[in-house]
């Protein structure tokens, strides 16, 4: 662990469901969950306040059901929101096994399972040293968990929004399909929007641009990558105003 002071005192980490699946097609990879909880515990040890938004694509993918007309878009999105709750429960317990006090806050009221999301309460918990996991997206259909991550990051006044992926940044084309793909070290929000690079959906990018909150895309499987980003070291791709 570095002796340096972290560059960011409060961050919002976006974990996609696909990232939590690791090498599996579906479900939660326990090794990934364990590594991420350890990385977050390291950040807490440095005094960094951590909010997390989790996706649900590892547990539910509604495109096929919607394509075949079996469920409508609104229902499909609601099913996806519930999938994020399951991922959030798993992450909460993984963190609490490391003695990291964690709050699970949902955009949808779910009684005994979570508490309802409130930005004021979330900020208070973060200041008290607790990790906050935000689930159920924005609570509304038609909005992605990327948009939810940017919204929550803005609401909790995070200094940086981090997107954990399976690649080490943003490329001009898919590096898994093109050996000559070029990685960007830095991009402006306008460049991402103009080139349609797929960092996040356009609504999410526009939100961050409007509120001047930088994004960092990094490889969650690379050792110490999350720590390096928070310490201000060169890691992944930075997207800024």
Curated annotation (Swiss-Prot):
What is the activity regulation comment for this entry? Answer: Inhibited by UTP.
Q: List the Gene Ontology MF annotations in alphabetical order.
A: ATP binding; UMP kinase activity
Q: What is its EC number?
A: 2.7.4.22
- Where ATP is bound, by residue? 14-17, 57, 61, 165, 171, 174
In the record, biological process GO terms are: 'de novo' CTP biosynthetic process; UDP biosynthetic process
Q: Which reaction does it catalyse?
A: UMP + ATP = UDP + ADP
Q: In which pathway does it act?
A: Pyrimidine metabolism; CTP biosynthesis via de novo pathway; UDP from UMP (UMPK route): step 1/1
Q: Does the keyword Kinase apply?
A: yes
Q: Name one Pfam family in it.
A: AA_kinase
UniProt subunit comment:
Homohexamer.
Check the record and name the PANTHER family matching this protein: URIDYLATE KINASE (PTHR42833), URIDYLATE KINASE PUMPKIN, CHLOROPLASTIC (PTHR42833:SF4)
> What's its job?
Catalyzes the reversible phosphorylation of UMP to UDP.
What does the similarity note say? Belongs to the UMP kinase family.
User: Which protein is depicted?
Assistant: Uridylate kinase
Which organism's genome codes for this protein? Psychrobacter arcticus (strain DSM 17307 / VKM B-2377 / 273-4)
């Amino acid at each position: 662990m570095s002796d340096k002071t972290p560059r960011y005192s409060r961050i919002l980490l976006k974990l996609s469901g696909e990232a939590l699946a690791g090498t599996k097609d579906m479900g939660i990879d326990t090794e990934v969950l364990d590594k991420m909880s350890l990385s977050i515990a390291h950040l807490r040890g440095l005094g960094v306040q951590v909010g997390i938004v989790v996706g649900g694509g590892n547990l539910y993918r509604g495109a096929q059901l919607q394509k075949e007309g079996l469920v409508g878009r609104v229902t499909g999105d609601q099913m996806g929101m519930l999938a994020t709750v399951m991922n959030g429960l798993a992450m909460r317990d993984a963190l609490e096994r490391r003695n990291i006090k964690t709050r699970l806050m949902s955009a949808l009221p779910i009684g005994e399972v979570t508490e309802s999301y409130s930005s004021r309460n979330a900020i208070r918990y973060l200041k008290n040293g607790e990790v906050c996991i935000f689930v159920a997206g924005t609570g509304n259909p038609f909005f992605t968990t990327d948009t939810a991550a940017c919204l929550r990051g803005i609401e909790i006044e995070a200094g940086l929004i981090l997107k954990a992926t399976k690649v080490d940044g943003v490329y001009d084309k898919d590096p898994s399909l093109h050996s000559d793909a070029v990685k960007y070290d830095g991009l402006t929000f306008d460049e991402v929007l103009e080139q349609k690079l797929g960092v996040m959906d356009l609504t999410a990018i526009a939100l961050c641009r409007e509120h001047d909150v930088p994004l960092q895309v990094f490889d969650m499987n690379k050792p110490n990558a999350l720590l390096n980003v928070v310490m201000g070291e060169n890691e992944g791709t930075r997207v800024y105003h």
